[in-house]
UniProtKB/Swiss-Prot annotation:
<protein>
    <recommendedName>
        <fullName>Cytidylate kinase</fullName>
        <ecNumber>2.7.4.25</ecNumber>
    </recommendedName>
</protein>
<comment type="similarity">
    <text>Belongs to the cytidylate kinase family. Type 1 subfamily.</text>
</comment>
<dbReference type="GO" id="GO:0036431">
    <property type="term" value="F:dCMP kinase activity"/>
</dbReference>
<dbReference type="GO" id="GO:0006220">
    <property type="term" value="P:pyrimidine nucleotide metabolic process"/>
</dbReference>
<dbReference type="GO" id="GO:0005524">
    <property type="term" value="F:ATP binding"/>
</dbReference>
<keyword id="KW-0067">ATP-binding</keyword>
<keyword id="KW-0808">Transferase</keyword>
<keyword id="KW-0963">Cytoplasm</keyword>
<dbReference type="InterPro" id="IPR027417">
    <property type="entry name" value="P-loop_NTPase"/>
</dbReference>
<keyword id="KW-0547">Nucleotide-binding</keyword>
<dbReference type="InterPro" id="IPR011994">
    <property type="entry name" value="Cytidylate_kinase_dom"/>
</dbReference>
<dbReference type="InterPro" id="IPR003136">
    <property type="entry name" value="Cytidylate_kin"/>
</dbReference>
<dbReference type="GO" id="GO:0036430">
    <property type="term" value="F:CMP kinase activity"/>
</dbReference>
<dbReference type="GO" id="GO:0015949">
    <property type="term" value="P:nucleobase-containing small molecule interconversion"/>
</dbReference>
<feature type="binding site">
    <location>
        <begin position="10"/>
        <end position="18"/>
    </location>
    <ligand>
        <name>ATP</name>
    </ligand>
</feature>
<dbReference type="Pfam" id="PF02224">
    <property type="entry name" value="Cytidylate_kin"/>
</dbReference>
<keyword id="KW-0418">Kinase</keyword>
Amino acid sequence: MLNISIAIDGPAGAGKSTIAKIIGNKLNIMYINTGSMYRAVTLMALKNNIEPYDIESLKALINSMNISFNGNNIIVNGKDLEEDIRMPIINNNVSKYAAVEEVRELLVSMQQNISKKYNVVMDGRDIGTVVLKDAPYKFFITASAEVRAKRRLKELEEKGINISFQDVLKEIKERDYIDSNRKVNPLKQSKDAILIDTSNFTIEEVVDKICNIIKRD
């Protein structure tokens, strides 16, 4: 399989990361969770008391971050941050940092460089519209806010994080609003992307649907 790139976009909690991860394994191509990159920047910014409006400090921070992936886990400067970036404080702040134009420019450049070297499946908010505009396969994965909140709540409970359904739903809706209304690369479906609503489908059914479309070509 040569020069293949698969773009998977969608709102928070739609299941796109899980779906992209399985597709990467099935097709034996590199999976890049671009959301993890924004989460890692958010984590490092909070640790260093850097506010979203402090552009120069944010740029310096990102340029000091050596980002790589070990399987599905994000590694920054040699440290595995996968568990740290899934904490509620990151969920509540990531959209603010991801909305900063300079942050997006630097991370998009990193993501595009990776796609030039490897066959990739990437998931995020602006993969099909910005990062991999010329990807031959584009999918927009969505589900109702309530379904997404239930999924996210289950994930958090499995990690021992105690939070109410209403709080998770509120967070999902707030992130949807910020992601869809930001000035730079807002969340939207690419015109040539295939829309898949996962509300009434299992992860396995969605993966099979996408893999069948790719293998058909």
